[in-house]
């Protein structure tokens, strides 16, 4: 049996499922498609965040211009100032700066978040490249087939080969904006991860500062508690001697012993808190707990004298959690538009060019030339209500994102209000504790001077020193709290707002970066990417 070249080419085209089709667009249809494409932006919500209340001040009461002066520092609340990027440097401690730098460079959690962000950006780049540009594929076919004989019709058994090599090009027009909206939704979700990564960086820095200050505060408390225990034990020994001489009652002895034991019982708990803080700090900066850094000298840490208070309307642009919620809202809005666009027709053009035949001589000759060009139009008609349900689901997701944004803003306002109130109250508590410590120290010094003159017994000096050390313990605790709460306020202020015109890939500018010059898959594979 013989076949001419036209039959050979036809068989190859059928094998590769390419059909020659002519498709002509009427001018009226083109105009309608353009009009619908221009209307694609109205397929869903705009994604603009809802209007939020703009309070005159954050808390139930307006914050003062500054706190009371405690230990010589009255912190000023600078209303309208921008957040400080590297706020931890304001503590004036090189050791603290080094800890934060080490943590930002070595934290496994932060590194994992960064890798996840980069993976999301690459996925966006791939989706934009595959959806906005034509796909080009090389197709090669080499087959050997056998057809059975049909003696009744005089057809003998036939064996033949099919060989073909084609370049296939396809492109789907984004007439109704489905592709654009899907890309916008994915870009917004990538921006969510970018803002979450930014929030993770700031949270890590704040946690390192809080852990370092907490460990230093506990260290100072342990030292002071140790001095109190030594004084209490000495007092108990003195009462024991006086009891043996009959100058002290048994009740006095038991009371002194109970006081010493009570102080001793508090020390293991403080040490456990201190060790836990050191272990936590080591892990935060990427070390094992046995490599925990030495404690800071609490006396060398300077309290920042000024703290920024971003106005409520600007807080929406400085807090990464609010920006992430806004990006989530934009993604949900684009999802509604994409779900709507799926209900409209899609148009795809395809073309192929190559060589084919039943033998290599035919494949390499002009008779083996193959080509196909075609277009397809697909209009959903009945999908069991799936497309309508998907759009309703997208609308509900959008409403949920809208409500989540509102809650995120309200929570941010509450966070700032709590931090401002805490700093004000911390200063008041520290001022009172410092006054108490100074007074107790004065009593101790006077009692000691009177003892040297023989006016009071030694145990009176020891008792006055105990009172001073107890007051000093409270002063240390409140100073540590004030330092930590200051860090929390810096953290609550967020980052300085970024000009969108100069926004780089470090924050929410992933769409343009991902869309830039998609590389060919073959080239990337050749480079091992």
List each language-model region with its residue ranges.
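Short flexible linkers and secondary-structure junctions
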Residues: 42-207, 347-351, 370, 381-391
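Outer-membrane beta-barrel proteins
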Residues: 147-149, 250, 358-362
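Periplasmic alpha-helical coiled-coil/stalk elements that build and connect Gram-negative outer-membrane
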Residues: 179, 188, 195-311, 422, ...
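Sec/SRP-type N-terminal targeting helices
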Residues: 111-112, 129, 173-201, 251, ...
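Membrane-embedded beta-strand positions in outer-membrane beta-barrel channels/transporters
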Residues: 100, 164-168, 212, 312, ...
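A short glycine-centered flexible hinge/capping loop motif at secondary-structure junctions
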Residues: 243-247, 451-455, 492-496
